[in-house]
């Protein structure tokens, strides 16, 4: 056990306020499956996260269909930094800091819409849709030398900070770090598992039902880890009542069984992970109903998806109930087709942004089924959403204590059992009820926090 985690019963904890790389590396022991609880509750660690994780990772902002036309925008966040995602005249997408360069006021105060320009409501500095400063009130009178006629103020130098932007099959990501690897390299061997939802048809995907937002008083890593690695909670106690309530009335509840067949994937690099059931459609039926279940597992759409993704070797029609996280805060549920962004709000709170994604050429009836069932199950008041939120909130409450942060947490399930060479699924794969992907996520978190240079951190 690493020295930073090791705790002799009754001995004092060594609290760290200046987190050195060595101290950070001691917070996560992937070889023994141990986590220091302070990673969820320490303010100074969180401040480092904003710089070293959220300042260097590819972060999901939304879907291309959120900004279909020139001037369409979505105001969102990268970490705690407000940004604007805008469709350009050439149909590209730009992302820039939602901050006026004069006194720092937001230049866009609407959640979404269409604009020809963005004007700061404080002093009226105006920016075009590319983020270029185009108008400053009293520019000549206030900034120029009237006697010499020389104006040392150059508007071209005072646009908001621009982020790198890249898309993957409809999803829009951005990154502040010019040294970070490109998006496809960053996603790495997780891409086939993303494609199960994103690339089922040549028509691609479309976001429906708007963006739902709510706040949960918990650390962002609890949410990210659950979608990365934790089928365990769904197969034990957390969601059983909701699943049983969704079983069709004609079925005999005494015959209901917890799924036992499935797998989990850990990315070779990057902290990404996924899990899914195989040949266990009962959970999908209980959550999404018979129409969505049939659409995903049978018929022309399912056959097309399996053919289209045949190069992966994965039996995509047999994969149900999938969960996935692209580190750090992009999470989604293929088959349920719900996407989440966990915006951090300090070490003890997240703002959840969620939307539903469907095949663009799916029948209207199927799109409506997805929309309706996602509201019922995965909205702020959804059947399963309330279960998850309650668990995360209660954990975070406990971490206010001194002793609660002094005992290492167990992440040992399936330790050493995952391996490459699975006959159906690519990459490092193990049993569905495991924590290999969680260990990968926390190990990558530890590396990003302790390795400032991409020379050592890169894939």
Curated annotation (Swiss-Prot):
Annotated [2Fe-2S] cluster binding sites: 100, 102, 120, 123
Assembly mode: Heterohexamer consisting of three BphA subunits and three BphE subunits. A ferredoxin (BphF) and a ferredoxin reductase (BphG) must be present to obtain activity.
A Gene Ontology molecular function term of the record: biphenyl 2,3-dioxygenase activity
Annotated protein name in UniProt: Biphenyl dioxygenase subunit alpha
GO biological process: catabolic process
Binding site for Fe cation: 233, 239
Pathway annotation from the record: Xenobiotic degradation; biphenyl degradation; 2-hydroxy-2,4-pentadienoate and benzoate from biphenyl: step 1/4
Cofactor note: Binds 1 [2Fe-2S] cluster per subunit.
Xref: SUPFAM superfamilies: Bet v1-like, ISP domain
Gene transcribed to yield this protein: bphA
InterPro entries: RHO_NdoB-like_C, Rieske_2Fe-2S, Rieske_2Fe-2S_sf, Ring-hydroxy_dOase_2Fe2S_BS, Ring_hydroxy_dOase_asu_C_dom, Rng_hydr_dOase-A
Organism of provenance: Paraburkholderia xenovorans (strain LB400)
Keywords recorded for this protein, A-Z: 2Fe-2S, Aromatic hydrocarbons catabolism, Dioxygenase, Iron, Iron-sulfur, Metal-binding, NAD, Oxidoreductase
Record has Iron as a keyword: yes
Superkingdom of the organism of origin: Bacteria
EC main group: oxidoreductase
